[in-house]
Amino acid sequence: MKNKVFASIGDAVKDIKVGRMVIVVDDPGRENEGDLICAAEKASPEVINFMTKYARGLICVPMKHERLKELEIENMVEKPTEKKGCSFTVSVDYKIGTTTGISAYDRSVTVRKLIDKTAKHEDFARPGHIFPLRCKEGGVLARTGHTEAAVDLVRLAGFYPAGIICEIMNNDGTMARMSDLIKFAKKHDLHIITIGELVNYRRRTEKFISEIVNVDLPTRYGDFKLVLFEDLITKDSHIAVVKGVVKNRQNVLVRVHSSCETGDIFHSLRCDCGDQLETALKAVGEAEQGVVLYIHQEGRGIGLANKLKAYRLQEKGMDTVEANKALGFDPDLRDYGIGAQMLSELGIKSINLMTNNPGKINGLESYGLKITKRVPLEISPSKSNEKYLKTKKEKMGHMLKKV
């Protein structure tokens, strides 16, 4: 294994291609589980035995809905209550040429037959010893689970989109955490990757934004073009408000603005979002060319309902970061790949970015955009939002001089 904790997605895909396993973890900064993953096409008694002997978790087969439908393999329960939203189906055994179904040989046969187009639904006994998992359409871009990571990885490796996964446990039966997984990887010469990096890889290498329509947009700030984009995975709509000719222009003035219904529409004084949007539109309207992106990522990515729940916690004394964490969210869940692809579709590669947020700069640059200059977009604090802005400066690193 290389002398670093996390391998590249490219290295992991190479391993999958030659039939090796990789370890996939939820998040490097959290105490979450790691799963062994390999391609279902590479299922063998040796692979199954390794998983049962060394990983010790439940062996499952993530796969696409279409194949499960062909085999008439239904969900295990009609209304799952499992908190991570993992979609288990009924367990199965392949009936032909197997015995009890539990041996490494029998389970490897069942895995291979699940993806064999000649195998029919009547060839499988229910229940059994292999647990198919229904992958969410869109893979890790739709759900950041091991199920989706497995299907994405094997697809990238050129195999049929189905994998084998098994949680890794310690000798004493406890779940293996990050330090344990690093030792496990070194012992067995395996690469470790994160689901987050797989998400980033797909967003960098695949197109998932499509232009739907563009229209003239006369406003109090000037005459613009409004370009509507659709996220092909989530079906969310995002807007680009464009001034002048921006295609192939250098250092275009850009604001990437996340939606804030309370601030942008109802002029809430809890935040500076509405004022920032108006200031950005005014600046772009006065420029020769520019763009304001309006991204559907309410509440820094947690959605309107959760944002309002966070407001309730703030009314009880928490700040915006503490409230997010109390609800189980990171302080900022926004995905800048959406904005980067919208700018790319508009033919823009270098920008002057209106922002106070260093995370936004890093996020956009990670997708290949050149940020020539940062243009501050600071709004004077009010009594209602002073604590909010102070928290953004002290806990989120925002570059604010007036707070």
Curated annotation (Swiss-Prot):
Binding residues for D-ribulose 5-phosphate: 30-31, 35, 143-147, 167
Residue sites binding Zn(2+) per the record: 260, 271, 273
Binding site for Mg(2+) 2: 31, 146
Pathways involved: Cofactor biosynthesis; riboflavin biosynthesis; 2-hydroxy-3-oxobutyl phosphate from D-ribulose 5-phosphate: step 1/1; Cofactor biosynthesis; riboflavin biosynthesis; 5-amino-6-(D-ribitylamino)uracil from GTP: step 1/4
Example GO molecular function: magnesium ion binding
Swiss-Prot/TrEMBL catalytic activity: D-ribulose 5-phosphate = (2S)-2-hydroxy-3-oxobutyl phosphate + formate + H(+); GTP + 4 H2O = 2,5-diamino-6-hydroxy-4-(5-phosphoribosylamino)-pyrimidine + formate + 2 phosphate + 3 H(+)
UniProt cross-references to SUPFAM superfamilies, sorted A to Z: RibA-like, YrdC/RibB
Active site: 332 (proton acceptor), 334 (nucleophile)
Site positions (Essential for DHBP synthase activity): 129, 167
Region feature DHBP synthase, mapped onto this chain: 1-204
GO BP field: riboflavin biosynthetic process
Keyword field contains Transcription: no
Cofactor(s) the record lists: Mg(2+); Mn(2+); Zn(2+)
Segments crossing the lipid bilayer: none
One GO CC annotation: cytosol
Record bears the keyword Magnesium: yes
Entry EC no(s): 4.1.99.12, 3.5.4.25
Keywords assigned by UniProt, alphabetized: GTP-binding, Hydrolase, Lyase, Magnesium, Manganese, Metal-binding, Multifunctional enzyme, Nucleotide-binding, Riboflavin biosynthesis, Zinc
Record's cofactor remark: Binds 2 divalent metal cations per subunit. Magnesium or manganese.
Binding residues for Mg(2+) 1: 31
Residues that bind GTP: 255-259, 276, 298-300, 320, 355, 360
Job of this protein: Catalyzes the conversion of D-ribulose 5-phosphate to formate and 3,4-dihydroxy-2-butanone 4-phosphate.
Family: In the N-terminal section; belongs to the DHBP synthase family.
PANTHER family in the record: 3,4-DIHYDROXY-2-BUTANONE 4-PHOSPHATE SYNTHASE, GTP CYCLOHYDROLASE II-RELATED
Official protein name in the record: Riboflavin biosynthesis protein RibBA
Organism from which the protein derives: Endomicrobium trichonymphae
